[in-house]
């Protein structure tokens, strides 16, 4: 109870303003009350993602919290959070992510001093790992990559990080293309796919070839190349059948489709794939992924992004979050290169979100300490 008595009624936070895409600082945000299966986390560090500007810009919800990835300390637990039901306990250092800019749960958002998080939608930070490193791993990227790679609705890859795919006798592991390998999602995808036993070919600028190779990519191609798709198809001996498109633009989709071998295959994009583009090659099965669906909640978004509650996917997500904890504790995955700001706090977060929006960040994960 001593920890509870130190928790204020209101807090500092960033929220959506009445102007779409503009974040507003407040000192009177109510500290959230807990549901029985939630924990209250005092936030220490947050990591930025493209969704931190895309959601407030494209899905304005004035007053809603913003920010997804976080790390911090559990300072209060809900009535159902107890040993035998949940692994987390009071005082644990944890990391994870929430669905921010959420009109159904406007209190959610990690750019704050305190957040309420479901006790099975996070992972415990191992001893010796700094908060800013844990925040940079978070759950946005690793969750979306896991969903895209291994769920039956998407690539449904054979093998897993725990049980790598076994090639046929005398053969080589299958290829997977990660389009956009020098992004935070890209370097995480490369690591997880390599753990699962695959060969990985990726795209980025030549300046980032060494970066993606340091995370395990077998071959990198310049995404500016006019014959990119044909070059990848030739390099993979016309056998590529799995593609993860982090960029998910009309151009990247066409290049990905051109890379897939004659027999066709599976494509998953990290943005909504319009039907008119998805169907340009009949031998390719296309899907797109939204990481927040792993929480199993209703997604109240328009423009084709919304979805009803999905308990099955929520159960899959909870299992993946636990697998993420195991990967972190085993030293199997590491974050994207970190640009850490220890001083600027909420002002720095606002500036960082604007940098992401202007496309000024490359090869770095922006992380801020909450001061």
Curated annotation (Swiss-Prot):
Pathway per the UniProt entry: Mycotoxin biosynthesis
Record keywords: NADP, Nucleotide-binding, Oxidoreductase
Residues involved in NADP(+) binding: 51-54, 182-185, 205-208, 223, 270-271, 361-362
SUPFAM superfamilies according to UniProt: GroES-like (SSF50129), NAD(P)-binding Rossmann-fold domains (SSF51735)
Gene from which the chain derives: mycC
GO molecular function: nucleotide binding; oxidoreductase activity, acting on NAD(P)H
Family: Belongs to the zinc-containing alcohol dehydrogenase family.
UniProt EC number: 1.-.-.-
Protein's UniProt name: Trans-enoyl reductase mycC
Catalytic activity: L-leucine + 8 malonyl-CoA + 4 S-adenosyl-L-methionine + ATP + 9 NADPH + 12 H(+) = (5S)-5-(2-methylpropyl)-3-[(2E,6R,8E,10E,12E)-6,8,10,12-tetramethyltetradeca-2,8,10,12-tetraenoyl]-2,5-dihydro-1H-pyrrol-2-one + AMP + 4 S-adenosyl-L-homocysteine + 8 CO2 + diphosphate + 9 NADP(+) + 8 CoA + 7 H2O
Binding site for substrate: 140-147, 291-295
InterPro entries in alphabetical order: ADH-like_C, ADH-like_N, GroES-like_sf, NAD(P)-bd_dom_sf, PKS_ER, Trans-enoyl_RdTase-like
Function: Trans-enoyl reductase; part of the gene cluster that mediates the biosynthesis of myceliothermophins, mycotoxins that contain a trans-fused decalin ring system connected to a conjugated 3-pyrrolin-2-one moiety and that have potential anti-tumor properties. The polyketide synthase module (PKS) of the PKS-NRPS mycA is responsible for the synthesis of the octaketide backbone. The downstream nonribosomal peptide synthetase (NRPS) module then amidates the carboxyl end of the octaketide with a leucine.
Subunit composition and interactions: Monomer.
């Amino acid at each position: 109870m001593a920890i509870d008595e130190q928790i204020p009624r209101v807090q500092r936070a960033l929220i959506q303003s009445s102007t779409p895409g503009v974040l507003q600082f407040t000192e009177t945000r109510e500290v959230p009350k807990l549901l029985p299966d939630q924990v209250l986390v005092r936030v220490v560090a947050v990591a930025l993602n493209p969704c931190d500007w895309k959601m407030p810009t494209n899905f304005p919800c004035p007053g809603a919290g913003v920010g997804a990835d976080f790390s911090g300390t559990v300072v209060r637990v809900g009535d159902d959070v107890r040993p035998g039901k949940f692994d987390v306990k009071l005082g644990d250092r944890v990391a994870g992510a929430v669905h921010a800019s959420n009109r159904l749960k406007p209190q959610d958002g990690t750019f704050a001093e305190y957040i309420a998080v479901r006790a099975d939608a996070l992972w415990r930070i191992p001893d010796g790992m700094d908060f800013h490193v844990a925040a940079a791993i978070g759950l946005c990227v690793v969750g979306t990559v896991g969903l895209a790679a291994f769920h039956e609705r998407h690539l449904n890859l054979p093998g897993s990080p725990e049980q790598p795919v076994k090639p046929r006798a005398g053969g080589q592991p299958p290829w997977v293309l990660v389009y956009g390998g020098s992004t935070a999602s890209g370097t995480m995808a490369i690591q997880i796919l390599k753990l699962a036993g695959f060969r990985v070919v990726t795209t980025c600028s030549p300046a980032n070839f060494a970066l993606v190779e340091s995370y395990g990519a077998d071959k990198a191609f310049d995404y500016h190349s006019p014959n990119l798709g044909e070059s990848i198809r030739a390099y993979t001996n016309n056998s590529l059948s799995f593609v993860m498109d982090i960029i998910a633009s009309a151009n990247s989709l066409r290049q990905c489709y051109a890379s897939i071998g004659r027999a066709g295959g599976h494509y998953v994009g990290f943005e909504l794939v319009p039907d008119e583009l998805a169907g340009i090659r009949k031998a390719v099965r296309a899907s797109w992924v939204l990481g927040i669906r792993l929480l199993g909640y209703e997604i109240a978004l328009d423009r084709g992004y919304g979805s009803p509650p999905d308990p099955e996917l929520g159960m899959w997500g909870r299992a993946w979050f636990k697998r993420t904890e195991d990967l972190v504790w085993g030293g199997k995955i590491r974050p994207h290169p970190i640009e850490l700001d220890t001083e600027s706090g909420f002002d720095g977060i606002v500036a960082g979100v604007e940098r992401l929006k202007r496309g000024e960040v490359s090869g770095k994960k922006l992380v801020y300490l909450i001061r």
